[in-house]
Amino acid sequence: PAYTTSAGWLGYSDEKLRALCQASLEKGWSHFKIKVGQNVEDDIRRLRIIREEIGWDRKVMLDANQVWDVNEAIQYMQQLAEFKPWWIEEPTSPDDVLGHAAIAYAIKPIGVATGEACQNRIIFKQLMQANAISFCQIDSCRMGGVNEVLAVILMAEKFGIPVCPHAGGVGLCEYVQHFAMFDYICVSGSLENRLVEYVDHLHEHFYHPVVMKDGRYMPPTAPGYSISMKEASLDEFEYPHGQAWST
């Protein structure tokens, strides 16, 4: 299972927001993530439009990208609670364990999700021990390799916290689908409350891009991690020698 971010970016007109929601519904999406945190009145307006378009039987998640301090996060989320968000992602600084715990306690039943900026198992362990997160968002490129990611997946299972990999980057959708499959097949055996982020751009640079159907990742059929980039893309964009950097 996956969630889409296509309608969630800041700065869209009401018409574009409605059109993106409708297009996502036609493709079978049932989970939508929305950026928030710059202006509460504007976020209320956007969330009202989104709920009008997708209804109340589909899930909405919010993402603040670390913009608040702890008290701001609590007060802001109290104003958005009427829209029944499933989680608030990165409400504050990613290494503020006790701050996340305070937010999680104050805004229940809304969950707290974080992890894309966490570099190792230690910070994840502290977040889990403090009951600071309801969703564990590993980032396969931020952390120290596959073994570090697997350690966090195993810890999350021990604490009963679903793993929802972060995939907002070049090739991350292709990469993290394999970790989600490992979690399901080898660790948790469950898809309940487990989602993989899907960002609908830059897949054309890979030989084996992800395949989506009705809001879900389809299992990859080629060997490897699905992240081999096309030679033309490397020639164009590799830093600092790519053609894109020489103009």
Question: Model-found features: residue ranges?
Answer:
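N-terminal capping/lid subdomain adjacent to the active-site entrance of alpha/beta enzymes
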Residues: P1-V60, N65-I74, Q78-E82, L202-T247
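A broad, low-specificity signal for short, low-complexity segments enriched in glycine/proline
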Residues: C21-S24, V97-L98, K125-Q126, M181
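Catalytic core of soluble alpha/beta enzymes
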Residues: I34-E174
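Structured C-terminal cap/extension of enzyme domains
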Residues: M143, L150-T247
